[in-house]
C-alpha cells in the first residue's frame, strides 16, 4: 500500500537537480540510489522507508509507502512541491487526471500524515491476525519484519484499539533499526533454492551463516529470508542445514543474539565455532523434509501434508481459558502414559 503522485511533464530533470533543490531548502537527505529508473532517498536519521522518484514516459512518479515515518511523508510532500516548481507542470494523485494536486504541502499535511499512520497499523494488524504470517517490508537500508511478537512487545493489540504512544515507540524503534543497520553486515546471499514446479517466484531465498578456514564468516545481524542456512565449508562430510526463518529463534544462543524485529537478530557477542556447530545440530531437528512445505494456518481448513484439520481457538470468545487448556493437555498425557 502506497501513495503516489505523478508530475506530467516533458522536461528532463536529472536527479541532482531536485536533490540539490531539497538540500538548499534545508532538507538533510541521504541518497541510496541516485539513478533512474528509481531514485531513492530519505531524511537523515529520521527515515524508515524513504521515498522514490521514478522516471516514467509521462514525466515523474513520486511514491511513499505505508509504514513510513513522519519524516518520510513530509519529504514526500516537499519532493512533489520541488518537482512542480522545477518543471512548472501539474501533479495528479495516483495518476488520476481528475485529482490535481495544486498545493502539496497543504494537501499532505500533519492530519493527512496521522491518517496514513493509523491506516498502516490497522491494515498490518488485520493482515497479521487473519493470516498468521509476518509481513516483510523494505526500508531505506534493510528489510524490516512485522509480526505478532513485535506488536505484543510494544503493547499493540492485533484485534482491538492501541495507544498511539505505543505505535510511535514502534516507529521510532524501526527508524533506529534502519540507521543502525546502515553500516552493518548481514547474512544475505543471492542463493535461491528453486521450486520443484520451476516457478521463479516460488524459489526460496537463503540467509547464510558459514564456517570457512576455521573461522565463522563475519556478520553483524541475521537478515530475513525464506530460509536460514548454516554451512561448515571446512568439513565436506557435514551437510549444510536449512530451516524456515520462523524457527530461527529456537537455535540461537540468547546471550549472543537479540531481536531486531519479528524475525531478524542482532549479534551482540562473539559467535564461536562451537556455537555454530551447536546451532547446526539444533537446526537439524527442525529442518523439514520438504523445504517448500507451508503449513496450513489455523482456521484455514485441511492440511494435506499433515492429513489434519488445523483449527483456531479464540480465547476472547471461548468459555475455556488457556489455563484450563494447559491443565487438560497435561492431564490427558498423564492418563494416556500411565
Report the location of each language-model feature.
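Short, intrinsically disordered low-complexity segments
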Residues: 20-72, 218, 228-231, 243, ...
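Short, extreme N-terminal segment that most often corresponds to the first beta-strand
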Residues: 1-38, 122-163, 281, 288-303, ...
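Short amphipathic alpha-helical segments
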Residues: 14, 71-79, 322-325, 329
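Extended non-globular C-terminal regions
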Residues: 189-327, 333-336
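Aromatic/basic-lined ligand-recognition segments
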Residues: 106-249, 254-257
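Hydrophobic, Leu/Ile/Phe/Ala-enriched alpha-helical segments that form helix-helix packing faces
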Residues: 21-29, 79-87, 330-337
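Internal, hydrophobic cores of structured domains that mediate oligomerization or house catalytic pockets
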Residues: 27, 34-41, 47-48, 54-163
Amino acid at each position: 500500500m502506497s501513495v503516489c503522485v505523478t508530475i506530467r511533464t516533458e522536461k528532463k530533470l536529472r536527479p541532482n537537480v531536485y536533490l540539490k533543490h531539497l538540500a538548499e531548502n534545508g532538507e538533510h537527505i541521504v541518497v541510496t540510489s541516485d539513478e533512474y529508473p528509481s531514485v531513492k532517498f530519505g531524511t537523515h536519521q529520521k527515515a524508515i522507508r524513504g521515498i522514490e522518484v521514478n522516471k516514467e514516459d509521462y514525466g515523474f512518479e513520486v511514491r511513499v509507502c505505508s509504514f513510513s515515518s513522519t519524516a518520510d511523508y513530509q519529504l514526500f510532500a516537499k519532493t512533489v512541491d520541488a518537482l512542480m516548481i522545477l518543471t512548472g507542470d501539474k501533479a495528479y494523485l495516483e495518476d488520476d487526471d481528475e485529482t490535481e494536486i495544486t498545493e502539496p504541502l497543504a494537501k499532505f499535511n500533519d492530519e493527512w500524515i496521522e491518517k496514513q499512520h493509523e491506516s498502516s497499523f490497522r491494515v498490518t494488524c488485520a493482515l497479521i491476525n487473519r493470516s498468521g504470517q509476518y509481513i516483510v517490508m523494505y526500508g531505506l537500508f534493510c528489510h524490516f519484519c512485522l509480526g505478532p511478537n513485535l506488536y505484543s512487545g510494544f503493547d499493540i493489540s492485533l484485534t482491538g484499539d492501541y495507544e498511539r504512544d505505543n505505535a510511535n515507540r514502534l516507529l521510532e524503534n524501526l527508524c533506529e533499526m534502519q540507521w543502525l543497520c546502515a553500516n552493518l553486515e548481514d547474512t544475505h546471499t543471492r542463493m535461491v533454492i528453486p521450486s520443484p514446479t520451476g516457478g521463479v517466484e516460488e524459489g526460496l531465498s537463503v540467509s547464510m551463516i558459514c564456517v570457512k578456514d576455521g573461522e565463522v564468516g563475519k556478520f553483524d545481524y541475521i537478515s530475513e529470508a525464506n530460509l536460514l542456512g548454516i554451512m561448515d565449508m571446512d568439513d565436506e562430510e557435514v551437510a549444510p542445514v536449512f530451516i524456515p526463518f520462523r524457527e530461527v529463534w529456537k537455535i540461537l544462543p540468547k546471550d549472543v543474539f537479540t531481536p531486531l524485529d519479528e524475525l531478524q537478530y542482532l549479534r551482540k557477542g562473539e559467535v564461536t565455532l562451537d556455537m555454530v556447530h551447536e546451532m547446526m545440530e539444533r537446526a537439524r531437528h527442525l529442518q523439514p523434509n520438504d523445504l517448500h512445505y507451508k503449513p496450513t494456518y489455523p482456521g484455514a481448513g485441511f492440511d494435506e501434508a499433515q492429513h489434519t484439520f488445523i483449527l483456531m481457538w479464540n480465547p476472547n470468545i471461548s468459555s475455556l481459558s488457556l489455563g484450563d487448556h494447559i491443565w487438560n493437555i497435561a492431564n490427558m498425557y498423564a492418563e494416556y502414559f500411565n
